Amino acid sequence: MAQSTKGAALVLSWQRCGDDSHWCSFLSVNLDDGSLAKGGDYVIWAEDADGSRKETVYVGQGKPVSNCLARHRDEVAITRHQRSGRVLRVTWAEVKKEHRGGVEHFLAQALQPLEGDRWSDDDPIQVNLPW
């Protein structure tokens, strides 16, 4: 598990896809990927096709992350953000169980997702943001 502390922050290894390390497509990322079988925190966002104008759609945590993402693929509140000229992206990081709630809380505060209104009550744990 690639987690270290840098000052007071927890440093996470945010996952990317492909040999060129591009941001993963939320709707087509391979949910059988081994890194998604672990527990962690994740961020779903919408952006223009050229990667500009990122808007965080949802942050969450769970184990396995693949099950969480599969469930979100069926939620119109999330998928509706992929529309003309906009694409949905996802990244995730393996996070120890005892830190997941705090990381989720921090991500929700920092990224202000458009969807979701219930996040962990754990004290926020500062982490490096994906972008």
Model-derived features: where do they sit?
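A broadly used, surface-exposed interaction patch
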Residues: S66-R89
